[in-house]
Curated annotation (Swiss-Prot):
Main location: membrane
InterPro entries: Ccz1, CCZ1/INTU/HSP4_longin_1, CCZ1/INTU/HSP4_longin_3, CCZ1/INTU_longin_2
Superkingdom of the organism of origin: Eukaryota
Keywords: Lysosome, Membrane
Keyword Transport listed: no
Phylogenetic placement of the source organism: Eukaryota, Metazoa, Chordata, Craniata, Vertebrata
Compartments, as annotated in UniProt: Lysosome membrane
GO BP terms: vesicle-mediated transport
Family: Belongs to the CCZ1 family.
GO cellular component, one term: intracellular membrane-bounded organelle
Protein name: Vacuolar fusion protein CCZ1 homolog
Length: 480
Protein backbone atom coordinates (compact mmCIF):
# COMPACT_ATOMS: atom_id res chain seq x y z
CA UNK A 1 0.00 0.00 0.00
CA UNK A 2 1.24 3.50 -0.89
CA UNK A 3 0.91 6.45 1.48
CA UNK A 4 2.07 9.94 0.52
CA UNK A 5 3.22 12.39 3.19
CA UNK A 6 3.97 16.01 2.20
CA UNK A 7 7.20 16.44 4.19
CA UNK A 8 9.39 17.94 1.49
CA UNK A 9 9.40 21.58 0.53
CA UNK A 10 8.84 22.98 -2.96
CA UNK A 11 5.99 20.60 -3.76
CA UNK A 12 8.17 17.47 -3.58
CA UNK A 13 6.66 14.58 -1.65
CA UNK A 14 7.90 11.49 0.11
CA UNK A 15 6.18 8.23 -0.75
CA UNK A 16 5.74 5.75 2.08
CA UNK A 17 5.11 2.08 1.29
CA UNK A 18 3.65 -0.18 3.98
CA UNK A 19 4.49 -3.93 4.33
CA UNK A 20 3.08 -6.07 1.52
CA UNK A 21 3.02 -9.74 0.53
CA UNK A 22 5.67 -10.58 -2.07
CA UNK A 23 5.20 -14.35 -2.17
CA UNK A 24 3.69 -17.27 -0.29
CA UNK A 25 4.46 -20.91 -0.92
CA UNK A 26 4.09 -24.40 0.54
CA UNK A 27 6.46 -27.26 -0.19
CA UNK A 28 7.44 -30.74 0.98
CA UNK A 29 11.10 -31.71 0.37
CA UNK A 30 10.19 -35.43 0.37
CA UNK A 31 8.07 -35.11 -2.80
CA UNK A 32 10.99 -34.30 -5.14
CA UNK A 33 14.20 -35.65 -3.62
CA UNK A 34 16.04 -36.39 -6.91
CA UNK A 35 17.72 -33.93 -9.24
CA UNK A 36 15.34 -32.82 -11.97
CA UNK A 37 12.27 -33.46 -9.80
CA UNK A 38 12.50 -30.24 -7.76
CA UNK A 39 9.19 -28.91 -9.10
CA UNK A 40 7.33 -31.82 -7.44
CA UNK A 41 8.19 -30.38 -4.02
CA UNK A 42 6.10 -27.26 -4.68
CA UNK A 43 2.49 -27.76 -3.58
CA UNK A 44 1.34 -24.14 -3.84
CA UNK A 45 3.01 -20.93 -5.01
CA UNK A 46 1.71 -17.36 -5.02
CA UNK A 47 1.91 -15.37 -7.22
CA UNK A 48 1.13 -18.06 -9.78
CA UNK A 49 2.72 -16.17 -12.71
CA UNK A 50 6.28 -16.52 -11.31
CA UNK A 51 8.50 -18.43 -13.75
CA UNK A 52 9.09 -22.13 -12.90
CA UNK A 53 12.87 -21.90 -12.44
CA UNK A 54 12.52 -18.95 -10.07
CA UNK A 55 10.00 -20.91 -7.97
CA UNK A 56 12.42 -23.86 -7.78
CA UNK A 57 15.30 -21.51 -6.89
CA UNK A 58 13.33 -19.79 -4.09
CA UNK A 59 12.14 -23.08 -2.59
CA UNK A 60 15.68 -24.49 -2.82
CA UNK A 61 17.05 -21.47 -0.96
CA UNK A 62 14.48 -21.93 1.83
CA UNK A 63 15.38 -25.63 2.09
CA UNK A 64 19.06 -24.71 2.42
CA UNK A 65 18.33 -22.13 5.15
CA UNK A 66 16.24 -24.64 7.13
CA UNK A 67 18.90 -27.37 6.83
CA UNK A 68 21.69 -24.96 7.78
CA UNK A 69 19.89 -23.73 10.91
CA UNK A 70 19.03 -27.32 11.90
CA UNK A 71 22.75 -27.96 12.48
CA UNK A 72 22.67 -25.45 15.35
CA UNK A 73 19.24 -26.34 16.77
CA UNK A 74 17.73 -29.58 15.38
CA UNK A 75 14.36 -29.12 17.15
CA UNK A 76 13.90 -25.42 16.26
CA UNK A 77 15.11 -24.54 12.76
CA UNK A 78 14.74 -21.11 11.15
CA UNK A 79 11.65 -19.03 11.94
CA UNK A 80 12.60 -15.95 9.90
CA UNK A 81 15.28 -14.53 7.61
CA UNK A 82 16.04 -10.79 7.60
CA UNK A 83 17.26 -8.98 4.49
CA UNK A 84 17.35 -5.30 3.62
CA UNK A 85 14.38 -5.44 1.24
CA UNK A 86 12.19 -8.19 2.68
CA UNK A 87 11.66 -10.68 5.45
CA UNK A 88 10.93 -14.38 5.06
CA UNK A 89 8.91 -16.35 7.61
CA UNK A 90 9.04 -20.14 7.92
CA UNK A 91 6.51 -22.47 9.55
CA UNK A 92 6.44 -26.29 9.66
CA UNK A 93 2.86 -27.06 10.81
CA UNK A 94 3.17 -30.77 9.99
CA UNK A 95 6.25 -32.92 9.54
CA UNK A 96 8.04 -32.02 6.26
CA UNK A 97 5.30 -29.58 5.18
CA UNK A 98 6.80 -26.08 5.08
CA UNK A 99 4.94 -22.79 4.65
CA UNK A 100 6.92 -19.69 3.66
CA UNK A 101 5.67 -16.10 3.59
CA UNK A 102 7.84 -13.32 2.12
CA UNK A 103 6.92 -9.78 3.20
CA UNK A 104 8.38 -6.66 1.61
CA UNK A 105 9.76 -4.31 4.25
CA UNK A 106 8.16 -0.85 4.59
CA UNK A 107 10.09 1.79 2.67
CA UNK A 108 10.26 5.51 2.05
CA UNK A 109 10.93 6.92 -1.43
CA UNK A 110 12.60 10.32 -1.18
CA UNK A 111 12.70 12.52 -4.30
CA UNK A 112 16.03 13.98 -5.45
CA UNK A 113 16.71 17.27 -7.17
CA UNK A 114 18.09 17.62 -10.69
CA UNK A 115 15.92 14.80 -12.04
CA UNK A 116 17.90 12.02 -10.35
CA UNK A 117 16.06 8.79 -9.43
CA UNK A 118 14.46 8.88 -5.96
CA UNK A 119 16.37 7.51 -2.97
CA UNK A 120 14.78 4.43 -1.39
CA UNK A 121 15.16 3.79 2.34
CA UNK A 122 13.99 0.42 3.66
CA UNK A 123 12.65 0.40 7.23
CA UNK A 124 13.32 -3.24 8.11
CA UNK A 125 13.24 -2.54 11.86
CA UNK A 126 9.51 -1.74 11.58
CA UNK A 127 8.64 -5.41 10.95
CA UNK A 128 8.12 -7.48 14.12
CA UNK A 129 8.84 -11.19 13.69
CA UNK A 130 6.29 -12.39 16.26
CA UNK A 131 3.43 -10.51 14.52
CA UNK A 132 4.01 -11.83 10.99
CA UNK A 133 5.05 -15.27 12.25
CA UNK A 134 1.63 -15.44 13.95
CA UNK A 135 -0.09 -14.35 10.71
CA UNK A 136 1.59 -17.28 8.91
CA UNK A 137 0.44 -19.69 11.63
CA UNK A 138 -3.11 -18.29 11.29
CA UNK A 139 -2.99 -19.10 7.55
CA UNK A 140 -2.49 -22.76 8.41
CA UNK A 141 -5.07 -22.77 11.22
CA UNK A 142 -7.71 -21.27 8.90
CA UNK A 143 -6.92 -23.81 6.17
CA UNK A 144 -7.14 -26.64 8.73
CA UNK A 145 -10.52 -25.36 10.00
CA UNK A 146 -12.12 -25.82 6.57
CA UNK A 147 -10.03 -28.64 5.07
CA UNK A 148 -8.41 -30.65 7.84
CA UNK A 149 -4.66 -31.31 7.87
CA UNK A 150 -2.33 -31.42 4.84
CA UNK A 151 -1.59 -35.10 5.50
CA UNK A 152 -5.32 -35.92 5.59
CA UNK A 153 -5.78 -34.57 2.04
CA UNK A 154 -2.62 -36.37 0.88
CA UNK A 155 -3.80 -39.69 2.32
CA UNK A 156 -7.25 -39.26 0.72
CA UNK A 157 -6.15 -38.33 -2.82
CA UNK A 158 -2.38 -37.93 -3.05
CA UNK A 159 -0.51 -34.82 -4.15
CA UNK A 160 -3.16 -33.96 -6.76
CA UNK A 161 -5.98 -33.58 -4.21
CA UNK A 162 -3.73 -31.71 -1.78
CA UNK A 163 -2.63 -29.15 -4.40
CA UNK A 164 -6.26 -28.66 -5.50
CA UNK A 165 -7.34 -27.93 -1.92
CA UNK A 166 -4.41 -25.58 -1.31
CA UNK A 167 -5.05 -23.62 -4.52
CA UNK A 168 -8.79 -23.37 -3.91
CA UNK A 169 -8.35 -22.13 -0.33
CA UNK A 170 -5.27 -19.90 -0.47
CA UNK A 171 -6.14 -18.20 -3.78
CA UNK A 172 -9.05 -16.51 -1.97
CA UNK A 173 -7.63 -16.36 1.56
CA UNK A 174 -4.41 -14.51 0.65
CA UNK A 175 -6.52 -11.69 -0.83
CA UNK A 176 -7.98 -11.07 2.63
CA UNK A 177 -4.57 -10.57 4.31
CA UNK A 178 -3.99 -6.92 5.23
CA UNK A 179 -0.37 -7.03 6.34
CA UNK A 180 -0.17 -3.27 6.86
CA UNK A 181 -2.64 -3.46 9.78
CA UNK A 182 -1.27 -6.56 11.56
CA UNK A 183 -0.19 -5.97 15.15
CA UNK A 184 -0.11 -7.36 18.69
CA UNK A 185 -3.67 -8.75 18.48
CA UNK A 186 -2.48 -11.14 15.76
CA UNK A 187 0.12 -12.50 18.18
CA UNK A 188 -2.53 -13.15 20.83
CA UNK A 189 -5.28 -14.46 18.53
CA UNK A 190 -7.65 -13.94 21.45
CA UNK A 191 -11.41 -13.89 21.92
CA UNK A 192 -13.46 -10.88 22.99
CA UNK A 193 -16.04 -11.94 25.60
CA UNK A 194 -19.34 -10.10 26.06
CA UNK A 195 -19.86 -8.81 29.64
CA UNK A 196 -23.07 -10.24 31.13
CA UNK A 197 -24.90 -10.34 34.46
CA UNK A 198 -25.49 -13.78 36.00
CA UNK A 199 -29.23 -13.97 35.30
CA UNK A 200 -28.88 -13.24 31.58
CA UNK A 201 -25.98 -15.71 31.33
CA UNK A 202 -28.18 -18.40 32.92
CA UNK A 203 -30.93 -17.61 30.37
CA UNK A 204 -28.43 -18.22 27.55
CA UNK A 205 -27.17 -21.44 29.13
CA UNK A 206 -30.76 -22.61 29.52
CA UNK A 207 -31.50 -21.72 25.86
CA UNK A 208 -28.45 -23.72 24.65
CA UNK A 209 -29.46 -26.74 26.78
CA UNK A 210 -33.07 -26.64 25.49
CA UNK A 211 -32.01 -26.44 21.85
CA UNK A 212 -29.42 -29.23 22.19
CA UNK A 213 -32.10 -31.41 23.83
CA UNK A 214 -34.71 -30.68 21.13
CA UNK A 215 -32.23 -30.95 18.24
CA UNK A 216 -30.28 -34.04 19.27
CA UNK A 217 -28.14 -33.89 16.11
CA UNK A 218 -26.36 -30.77 17.44
CA UNK A 219 -22.94 -31.79 18.77
CA UNK A 220 -21.44 -28.39 19.69
CA UNK A 221 -22.92 -24.92 20.17
CA UNK A 222 -21.40 -21.43 20.37
CA UNK A 223 -23.36 -18.28 21.29
CA UNK A 224 -22.19 -14.77 20.36
CA UNK A 225 -23.65 -11.31 20.84
CA UNK A 226 -22.41 -8.17 19.12
CA UNK A 227 -19.45 -10.15 17.67
CA UNK A 228 -18.37 -11.16 21.19
CA UNK A 229 -18.42 -14.68 22.62
CA UNK A 230 -20.72 -15.66 25.49
CA UNK A 231 -20.83 -19.47 25.38
CA UNK A 232 -18.87 -22.19 23.58
CA UNK A 233 -18.84 -25.99 23.72
CA UNK A 234 -15.72 -26.25 21.54
CA UNK A 235 -12.11 -26.68 22.64
CA UNK A 236 -10.31 -23.33 23.08
CA UNK A 237 -7.98 -23.61 20.08
CA UNK A 238 -10.84 -24.61 17.76
CA UNK A 239 -13.03 -21.77 19.06
CA UNK A 240 -10.28 -19.16 18.68
CA UNK A 241 -9.89 -19.82 14.93
CA UNK A 242 -13.66 -20.20 14.35
CA UNK A 243 -14.13 -16.88 16.21
CA UNK A 244 -11.61 -15.20 13.90
CA UNK A 245 -13.46 -16.52 10.83
CA UNK A 246 -16.85 -15.36 12.15
CA UNK A 247 -15.75 -11.86 13.19
CA UNK A 248 -13.45 -11.02 10.27
CA UNK A 249 -15.17 -12.81 7.39
CA UNK A 250 -18.72 -14.12 7.89
CA UNK A 251 -20.35 -11.45 10.09
CA UNK A 252 -19.01 -8.41 8.15
CA UNK A 253 -20.58 -9.87 4.98
CA UNK A 254 -24.00 -9.93 6.66
CA UNK A 255 -24.17 -6.59 8.45
CA UNK A 256 -27.63 -5.28 9.23
CA UNK A 257 -29.17 -2.33 11.11
CA UNK A 258 -29.10 -2.96 14.84
CA UNK A 259 -32.53 -3.57 16.35
CA UNK A 260 -33.18 -2.00 19.73
CA UNK A 261 -34.48 -3.45 22.99
CA UNK A 262 -37.93 -4.49 24.14
CA UNK A 263 -39.28 -0.94 24.47
CA UNK A 264 -38.41 -0.11 20.86
CA UNK A 265 -41.20 0.42 18.28
CA UNK A 266 -39.19 -1.93 16.05
CA UNK A 267 -40.26 -4.79 18.29
CA UNK A 268 -43.98 -4.51 19.11
CA UNK A 269 -45.42 -7.07 21.53
CA UNK A 270 -48.04 -9.19 19.79
CA UNK A 271 -50.11 -11.43 22.06
CA UNK A 272 -49.87 -15.11 21.19
CA UNK A 273 -47.44 -14.45 18.38
CA UNK A 274 -43.75 -14.49 19.24
CA UNK A 275 -41.68 -12.19 17.07
CA UNK A 276 -39.20 -13.89 14.77
CA UNK A 277 -36.17 -12.04 13.36
CA UNK A 278 -34.08 -15.21 12.86
CA UNK A 279 -32.27 -16.13 9.64
CA UNK A 280 -29.52 -18.45 8.43
CA UNK A 281 -26.11 -16.86 7.71
CA UNK A 282 -24.86 -20.18 6.30
CA UNK A 283 -27.07 -22.53 4.30
CA UNK A 284 -30.46 -21.47 2.84
CA UNK A 285 -30.85 -17.73 2.28
CA UNK A 286 -34.65 -18.07 2.23
CA UNK A 287 -36.53 -21.11 3.58
CA UNK A 288 -39.65 -20.20 1.57
CA UNK A 289 -37.73 -20.50 -1.70
CA UNK A 290 -38.60 -23.89 -3.30
CA UNK A 291 -35.14 -23.87 -4.94
CA UNK A 292 -33.32 -23.25 -1.62
CA UNK A 293 -30.03 -25.13 -1.20
CA UNK A 294 -29.41 -26.88 2.11
CA UNK A 295 -25.63 -26.98 1.90
CA UNK A 296 -23.55 -25.79 4.84
CA UNK A 297 -19.80 -25.18 5.12
CA UNK A 298 -17.86 -28.01 6.73
CA UNK A 299 -15.29 -27.49 9.46
CA UNK A 300 -12.74 -29.75 11.13
CA UNK A 301 -12.19 -29.69 14.90
CA UNK A 302 -10.12 -31.76 17.35
CA UNK A 303 -7.63 -32.36 14.53
CA UNK A 304 -4.90 -33.37 17.00
CA UNK A 305 -6.98 -36.34 18.20
CA UNK A 306 -10.03 -37.77 16.44
CA UNK A 307 -10.45 -35.05 13.74
CA UNK A 308 -14.21 -34.46 13.60
CA UNK A 309 -15.82 -33.17 10.40
CA UNK A 310 -18.89 -31.03 11.09
CA UNK A 311 -21.58 -28.99 9.32
CA UNK A 312 -21.41 -25.34 10.45
CA UNK A 313 -24.85 -23.75 10.81
CA UNK A 314 -24.72 -20.07 11.77
CA UNK A 315 -28.11 -18.63 12.71
CA UNK A 316 -28.68 -14.98 13.65
CA UNK A 317 -31.44 -12.88 15.18
CA UNK A 318 -30.75 -9.16 15.66
CA UNK A 319 -27.28 -8.94 17.28
CA UNK A 320 -27.26 -12.51 18.61
CA UNK A 321 -25.69 -15.34 16.60
CA UNK A 322 -25.60 -19.05 17.37
CA UNK A 323 -23.31 -21.62 15.75
CA UNK A 324 -24.68 -25.16 15.64
CA UNK A 325 -22.19 -27.87 14.70
CA UNK A 326 -23.53 -31.23 13.45
CA UNK A 327 -21.69 -34.37 12.34
CA UNK A 328 -20.91 -34.10 8.60
CA UNK A 329 -22.19 -37.63 7.93
CA UNK A 330 -25.75 -36.41 8.66
CA UNK A 331 -27.79 -35.26 5.65
CA UNK A 332 -29.33 -31.87 6.50
CA UNK A 333 -32.61 -31.31 4.64
CA UNK A 334 -35.45 -28.78 4.44
CA UNK A 335 -37.41 -30.46 7.25
CA UNK A 336 -34.52 -30.12 9.71
CA UNK A 337 -33.84 -26.47 8.78
CA UNK A 338 -37.53 -25.55 9.14
CA UNK A 339 -37.63 -27.24 12.55
CA UNK A 340 -34.51 -25.35 13.66
CA UNK A 341 -35.88 -22.05 12.34
CA UNK A 342 -39.26 -22.39 14.08
CA UNK A 343 -37.65 -23.53 17.36
CA UNK A 344 -34.68 -21.16 17.55
CA UNK A 345 -35.96 -18.03 15.73
CA UNK A 346 -38.54 -16.74 18.27
CA UNK A 347 -36.46 -17.76 21.33
CA UNK A 348 -33.28 -16.15 19.99
CA UNK A 349 -35.15 -12.95 19.04
CA UNK A 350 -36.50 -12.64 22.59
CA UNK A 351 -33.12 -13.47 24.11
CA UNK A 352 -31.29 -10.94 21.89
CA UNK A 353 -33.76 -8.26 22.95
CA UNK A 354 -33.25 -9.12 26.64
CA UNK A 355 -29.45 -8.97 26.31
CA UNK A 356 -29.68 -5.61 24.55
CA UNK A 357 -32.02 -4.26 27.24
CA UNK A 358 -29.78 -5.47 30.08
CA UNK A 359 -26.68 -4.08 28.37
CA UNK A 360 -28.32 -0.65 27.96
CA UNK A 361 -29.40 -0.64 31.64
CA UNK A 362 -25.83 -1.39 32.73
CA UNK A 363 -24.48 1.38 30.51
CA UNK A 364 -26.96 3.88 31.99
CA UNK A 365 -25.92 2.87 35.52
CA UNK A 366 -22.21 3.23 34.75
CA UNK A 367 -22.83 6.69 33.28
CA UNK A 368 -21.69 8.30 30.01
CA UNK A 369 -18.38 7.13 28.60
CA UNK A 370 -15.66 9.77 28.73
CA UNK A 371 -12.57 9.75 26.56
CA UNK A 372 -10.00 8.25 28.95
CA UNK A 373 -6.43 9.50 29.23
CA UNK A 374 -5.20 5.99 28.56
CA UNK A 375 -5.74 3.19 26.05
CA UNK A 376 -5.01 -0.46 26.77
CA UNK A 377 -4.78 -4.04 25.47
CA UNK A 378 -5.39 -6.94 27.86
CA UNK A 379 -4.85 -10.65 27.18
CA UNK A 380 -5.30 -13.73 29.35
CA UNK A 381 -3.35 -16.78 28.10
CA UNK A 382 -5.50 -19.18 30.15
CA UNK A 383 -8.94 -18.47 28.63
CA UNK A 384 -7.79 -16.44 25.57
CA UNK A 385 -9.81 -13.42 26.79
CA UNK A 386 -8.82 -10.27 24.94
CA UNK A 387 -9.88 -6.66 25.43
CA UNK A 388 -8.67 -3.60 23.56
CA UNK A 389 -9.62 0.07 23.65
CA UNK A 390 -7.00 0.74 20.96
CA UNK A 391 -8.69 -1.15 18.13
CA UNK A 392 -11.81 -0.21 16.19
CA UNK A 393 -12.76 -3.14 13.93
CA UNK A 394 -14.98 -1.59 11.27
CA UNK A 395 -14.17 -3.53 8.13
CA UNK A 396 -13.72 -7.20 7.28
CA UNK A 397 -10.19 -8.39 8.06
CA UNK A 398 -8.91 -4.87 8.71
CA UNK A 399 -8.04 -3.83 12.23
CA UNK A 400 -8.05 -0.05 12.60
CA UNK A 401 -6.14 1.43 15.54
CA UNK A 402 -6.63 4.75 17.28
CA UNK A 403 -2.94 5.27 18.13
CA UNK A 404 0.19 6.05 16.10
CA UNK A 405 2.00 3.09 14.45
CA UNK A 406 5.18 3.96 16.41
CA UNK A 407 3.34 3.23 19.66
CA UNK A 408 2.01 -0.07 18.28
CA UNK A 409 5.62 -0.97 17.42
CA UNK A 410 6.66 -0.33 21.04
CA UNK A 411 3.83 -2.61 22.25
CA UNK A 412 5.11 -5.35 19.95
CA UNK A 413 8.68 -4.90 21.19
CA UNK A 414 7.58 -5.15 24.83
CA UNK A 415 5.64 -8.33 24.01
CA UNK A 416 8.80 -9.83 22.44
CA UNK A 417 10.70 -9.05 25.66
CA UNK A 418 7.97 -10.77 27.70
CA UNK A 419 8.14 -13.86 25.47
CA UNK A 420 11.86 -14.33 26.21
CA UNK A 421 11.36 -14.89 29.95
CA UNK A 422 8.95 -16.93 32.06
CA UNK A 423 8.99 -14.64 35.08
CA UNK A 424 6.42 -11.90 35.78
CA UNK A 425 7.73 -8.46 34.93
CA UNK A 426 6.89 -4.84 34.13
CA UNK A 427 8.37 -2.54 31.47
CA UNK A 428 7.83 1.23 31.24
CA UNK A 429 8.87 3.17 28.11
CA UNK A 430 8.83 6.92 27.42
CA UNK A 431 8.16 7.35 23.70
CA UNK A 432 9.70 10.09 21.53
CA UNK A 433 6.21 11.56 21.16
CA UNK A 434 6.00 12.05 24.98
CA UNK A 435 3.55 9.18 25.45
CA UNK A 436 4.18 6.66 28.22
CA UNK A 437 3.86 2.95 27.34
CA UNK A 438 3.56 0.39 30.14
CA UNK A 439 3.61 -3.40 29.86
CA UNK A 440 2.73 -5.72 32.76
CA UNK A 441 3.05 -9.51 32.70
CA UNK A 442 1.59 -11.33 35.69
CA UNK A 443 0.24 -14.85 36.22
CA UNK A 444 -0.41 -15.71 32.52
CA UNK A 445 -1.94 -12.28 31.89
CA UNK A 446 -0.56 -9.36 29.93
CA UNK A 447 -1.62 -5.72 30.09
CA UNK A 448 -0.33 -2.94 27.83
CA UNK A 449 -1.22 0.69 28.58
CA UNK A 450 -0.61 3.87 26.55
CA UNK A 451 -0.79 7.08 28.62
CA UNK A 452 -1.00 10.58 27.18
CA UNK A 453 0.62 12.45 30.09
CA UNK A 454 3.85 13.99 28.88
CA UNK A 455 4.62 15.83 32.13
CA UNK A 456 4.13 12.77 34.35
CA UNK A 457 7.04 11.04 36.08
CA UNK A 458 7.61 7.32 36.69
CA UNK A 459 5.83 7.32 40.06
CA UNK A 460 2.76 9.10 38.64
CA UNK A 461 2.63 6.74 35.66
CA UNK A 462 2.79 3.75 38.00
CA UNK A 463 -0.06 5.16 40.11
CA UNK A 464 -2.16 5.80 37.00
CA UNK A 465 -1.72 2.18 35.85
CA UNK A 466 -2.72 0.97 39.35
CA UNK A 467 -5.90 3.06 39.11
CA UNK A 468 -6.64 1.56 35.68
CA UNK A 469 -6.22 -1.97 37.08
CA UNK A 470 -8.55 -1.12 39.98
CA UNK A 471 -11.33 0.25 37.73
CA UNK A 472 -11.10 -1.98 34.64
CA UNK A 473 -9.74 -5.20 36.19
CA UNK A 474 -10.91 -5.07 39.81
CA UNK A 475 -11.40 -8.85 39.97
CA UNK A 476 -7.97 -9.64 38.49
CA UNK A 477 -4.84 -9.70 40.59
CA UNK A 478 -1.79 -8.01 39.05
CA UNK A 479 1.49 -8.23 40.93
CA UNK A 480 3.02 -4.86 41.81
Amino acid sequence: MLMISPRMASGMQEKQYTPSLLSFFIYNPKFGPREGEEEKKILFYHPIEIEKNEKIRNVGLCEAIVQFTRTFCPTKPAKSLHTQKNRQFFHEPEENYWMVMVVRNPMVEKPNKDGKPPTVEYQEEEIIDSVYGSVLQQCYSMYKLFNGTFSRAFEAGGVELLTQKLEKFFYRYLQTLHLQSCDLLDVFGGISFFPLDKMTYLKIQSFVNRVEESLSLVKYTAFLYNDQLIWSGLEQDDMRILYKYLTTSLFPRHTEPELAGRDSPLRPEVAGNLLHYGRFLTGPANLKDPEAKFRFPRIFVNTEDSCEELHLIVYKAMSAAVCFMINASVDLNREFCEKLDSLVGPQLTLLASDICEQYNINRRISGPEKEPQFKFIYFNHMNLAEKSTIHMRKMASVSLTSVHPDLMKILGDINCDFARVDEDEEIIVKAMTDYWVVGKKSDQRELYVILNQKNANLIEVNEEVKRLCATQFNNIFFLD
